Amino acid sequence: MKILYSPRRFYPVETLFNGTLSLGGRDQETTGFAWWAGNARLINLSGKLLGAHVAHAGLIVFWAGAMNLFEVAHFVSEKPMYEQGLILLPHLATLGWGVGPGGEVADTFPYFVSGVLHLISSAVLGFGGIYHALIGPETLEESFPFFGYTWKDKNKMTTILGIHLILLGFGAFLLVFKALYFGGLYDTWAPGGGDVREITNLTLNPNIIFGYLLKSPFGGEGWIASVDNLEDIIGGHVWLGSICIFGGIWHILTKPFAWARRAFVWSGEAYLSYSLGALAIFGFTACCFVWFNNTAYPSEFYGPTGPEASQAQAFTFLVRDQRLGANIGSAQGPTGLGKYLMRSPTGEIIFGGETMRFWDLRAPWLEPLRGPNGLDLGKLKRDIQPWQERRSAEYMTHAPLGSLNSVGGVATEINAVNYVSPRSWLATSHFVLGFFFFVGHLWHAGRARAAAAGFEKGIDRDTEPVLSMTPLN
């Protein structure tokens, strides 16, 4: 096969390290990369790069299966999931597996099955990765032209993009089918404190679905993270799955337009940078979603959101003091504002005290107590149910910020020794990973653009400070 360009021409990164270590001819001299540069050595070896990708997928799936079984083995049914440091079982419970009313786990067998299936899948992927890395053809273009490619082949690249989009679309529809036909999903808003239910009345109105994208990300608007019902979530997956599938078909059947051919850099490193940029956006979006949204990420499994824990504290003390005879409608706090209840900027009745900054919170344990003008004083006096009291007391003491009390918003009693909320773990990890993916995007985009412009020189090692230092040995 004729290679369209020399990897050493485009990627002449020099290193101080010993370049003699090689594997199957993939050494620094022939590839332009030292052994520790990993998959960069395989840029023009499509068969070996396939092996690396399949093996990587196997590692990911192996972790999922092993961690899944680890959590099942340590699961205690008497305690809520968020108190046990679980990060995978909450996802399975949200999908409706093994849970019943109120989010109580009735059966852990589906979780065990999930773990075993992932382990078996990882073994298949692992064998495939080893085969393609060590035994299979180095390049696919000669033996399997459908799977072969060159990075500069714009039409082939958009065809591969199309195939990926179709697979993503099918993934979105898997959730739709689970919600509609295979047992439903856990709905935290189901009457009486949440339950598993099949979704029957999808929201397919494009004005509603795409209206989320046009919302402000600030305050009570909340962009797409403000979705508060499963009908909109599943309807959104129908739209997204359809767009991905039709977009994939479009990219397979068409060739890139002239403007696209001119606008993009067409090289392996450029595609890597585009992918990292997309993953960074996904990570930042997931961070906001898991931190603020208690519909897609039910508080029964992930623990309360920050605003939810704060409002739960106000509600818990309101219930206590009302039983002791306090008049919650007129009592004043030390600032002269309402101690238990006050008015929001838009005139609604909200909880008083410091939690007023979270006045636009919506939570299933609190919504039944609202009326047309915010919290209903009559309902607060007569209609509070025991399950609402229990849940708010539980959420009050399990804030994702790791704090029960605070002064002016500064935490004073950090409780992060015996309890860290899975919501905190997931939000923080996705933000940090999203940030590093974004930095990787900038790094590889800069290298790809420089290589395309012809001035990528690598790092100048002649003036490297380490050269003037005494050798370690």
Curated annotation (Swiss-Prot):
The modification N-acetylthreonine is found at T15. It is found in: Plastid, Chloroplast thylakoid membrane. GO terms for molecular function: chlorophyll binding; electron transporter, transferring electrons within the cyclic electron transport pathway of photosynthesis activity; metal ion binding. [CaMn4O5] cluster binds at E367. Pfam families: PSII. Binds multiple chlorophylls and provides some of the ligands for the Ca-4Mn-5O cluster of the oxygen-evolving complex. It may also provide a ligand for a Cl- that is required for oxygen evolution. PSII binds additional chlorophylls, carotenoids and specific lipids. Its main location: plastid. The chain crosses the membrane at residues 69-93, 134-155, 178-200, 255-275, 291-312, 447-471. Gene3D superfamilies: photosystem ii from thermosynechococcus elongatus. GO terms for biological process: photosynthetic electron transport in photosystem II. It is a multi-pass membrane protein. Residues 1-14 form a propeptide. GO terms for cellular component: chloroplast thylakoid membrane; photosystem II. The modification Phosphothreonine is found at T15. Keywords: Acetylation, Chlorophyll, Chloroplast, Chromophore, Manganese, Membrane, Metal-binding, Phosphoprotein, Photosynthesis, Photosystem II, Plastid, Thylakoid, Transmembrane, Transmembrane helix. Belongs to the PsbB/PsbC family. PsbC subfamily. One of the components of the core complex of photosystem II (PSII). It binds chlorophyll and helps catalyze the primary light-induced photochemical processes of PSII. PSII is a light-driven water:plastoquinone oxidoreductase, using light energy to abstract electrons from H(2)O, generating O(2) and a proton gradient subsequently used for ATP formation. PSII is composed of 1 copy each of membrane proteins PsbA, PsbB, PsbC, PsbD, PsbE, PsbF, PsbH, PsbI, PsbJ, PsbK, PsbL, PsbM, PsbT, PsbX, PsbY, PsbZ, Psb30/Ycf12, at least 3 peripheral proteins of the oxygen-evolving complex and a large number of cofactors. It forms dimeric complexes. This is Photosystem II CP43 reaction center protein.
